[in-house]
Amino acid sequence: MIAAAHASIVEEGVAAMSIRNICSAAGHSQGAFYSNFASKDDLLVDILQSHIQDEVTLLRDIVAQCVGDDIEATLEVLADRLAKLAEEPQWSLLSIELQLHARRNPAFAERHREGKAACYRMFGELVADLVRRFSLRPALPAEQTGIGLYALWMGLAVQGDVEGAISRDEMLVGFFRAMAGLDVLEPAKP
């Protein structure tokens, strides 16, 4: 049902998504839907939270599996994963659709705010892992850096490809480097 809902959102948008169509696509009854979710909004928040939790868990595992104290190697591995994630625009589109839905629907906005707060905490934990592991001295607290990383990712997703800009993964790693007080790499000459 989650996969069918996700596909519906990406194809039609949140406003056009119907529980009946989701259930039909998933091969379930509407009763099955309501035995798992109180409303369409609950489903929407669940979809986004579960994806972000899975992704942050994967990123934290990547950090934990990196050997040694070479932050550059760790950032390179994280950038590789972020580049792969950027190739899956449906997740960024989903997040943007939900943000727009929250802006238009006050009842959903509160649930969405709670869901985003959980996501920010998860990103903050990832940043805290890096700070501890490499004894970094960040410019902002870990959760605030996580909020900034998430906002930057979403903003870049909305922008799409920008002529002359570096890739999303390079931009995120550059932002993290700046926030972590790491040496900033010289910008490439055009």
Q: What residue spans do the PLM features occupy?
A:
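Generic hydrophobic, amphipathic alpha-helix propensity
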Residues: M1-H6, I22, I47-H51, E55, ...
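Helix-turn-helix
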Residues: A4-D42, D46
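Solvent-exposed, amphipathic alpha-helical segments
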Residues: A4-E12, L58-I62, L94-L98, L152-Q159
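Residues in soluble alpha-helical coiled-coils and helical-bundle/repeat scaffolds
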Residues: A38-D42, D46, Q53, A86-Q90, ...
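Hydrophobic alpha-helical connector segments
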Residues: D46, R60-W91, A142-L149
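Amphipathic alpha-helical packing segments from all-alpha helical-bundle domains
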Residues: V56-T57, D61, E87-I96, P106-R133, ...
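Helix-loop "lid/cap" segments that line or gate small-molecule binding pockets
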Residues: D80-A86, L94-R104, A178
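Hydrophobic/aromatic-rich alpha-helical bundle segments in the mid-to-C-terminal region
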Residues: F108-E110, L130-L182, E186-P190
